[in-house]
Amino acid sequence: MINIWTEKYRPKRLDDVIGEDENINTLKSFVKNGDLPHLIFAGPAGTGKTSTAIALTIELFGDDWKENFLELNASDERGIDIIRNNIKDFAKIRPSNKLGFKIIFLDEADQLTNEAQAALRRTMEMFYSTTRFIFSCNYSSKIIPPIQSRCVVLRFRPLDKEAMERKLREIAKNEKFDIDDDSLDAIYEISDGDMRKAINVMQAIQSTGEIKPSKIYEISGEINKNEYKNLISLSLNGAFSDAKSLLDKMLVDYGLSGIDIIRGMHSAIRNERIANRQKLEILIALAEFEFRISQGGSDNVQMDALLARISYIGSEIT
């Protein structure tokens, strides 16, 4: 039976959570006091929101944590029924633990409709004596103000390179295989601070027995950031035919969408040494053509036009 590494290496205690010292210290103070407010965990995917919620529950309830923890995903059941049924059924049963409350963890809470959130706000008030809510979301701004005002908001950030690579080395050592710096750099670039994605990529590459950057990009369906830099550079310097060939390779051989490529270009251009005005115009163009594609424009037509725009920027703007 294959162990899923993201579960195998999920933090079991708050001290095991990496890269979120301020948030962890705040949660430890709640544990020490034996009480908990409603919480909002806000941040991108893979930043440890679910793992932190589980570690917090284990700290509070010990071996009985599963009896006192309900995890639901709002994106699976977006309507108001999730509030009336699953949550109310769990909340109305009085807890048997000494703290006197249970925890409901609602993942992707920003996917709930406003109507469902309003119903949830009433449920929070009705069952506060027995239930605490932890809302996990990408954007706290999508949680209605009446819920936000009843919660402590903790913001989770993508893991920095040093912390991620330290954890990946620890996993590699435990799994008894070697991984070099270049491969770790490739995993970090692909995951962009998402620890869950990084661990999944490393497990996938370890299973192939071929641990090297090129294989990492291949198995993850990603390409090296330098390819995006080359695409921008070729276009900017007027080598339109070469840029078009590279674009076709990305679209056909790598199977990337136009929006994938635009977002890769956006990430790549941030630290490029390009004249400020040129960089400004390119960023505006990236936003414009991403919008065009999102509204139904053809990937091929719009991406060709984007390269032409960047070529124009290179020739006319200094």
Swiss-Prot record:
GO terms for molecular function: ATP binding; ATP hydrolysis activity; DNA binding; DNA clamp loader activity. GO terms for biological process: DNA repair; DNA-templated DNA replication. InterPro entries: AAA+_ATPase, ATPase_AAA_core, DNA_pol3_clamp-load_cplx_C, DNA_Rep/Repair_Clamp_Loader, P-loop_NTPase, Rep_factor-C_ssu_arc, Rep_factorC_C, RFC_lid. CDD domains: AAA, HLD_clamp_RFC. It comes from the Archaea. GO terms for cellular component: DNA replication factor C complex. SMART domains: AAA (SM00382). Keywords: ATP-binding, DNA replication, Nucleotide-binding. ATP binds at G43, P44, A45, G46, T47, G48, K49, T50. NCBIfam families: PRK00440.1. Belongs to the activator 1 small subunits family. RfcS subfamily. Part of the RFC clamp loader complex which loads the PCNA sliding clamp onto DNA. Heteromultimer composed of small subunits (RfcS) and large subunits (RfcL). This is Replication factor C small subunit. The gene is rfcS.
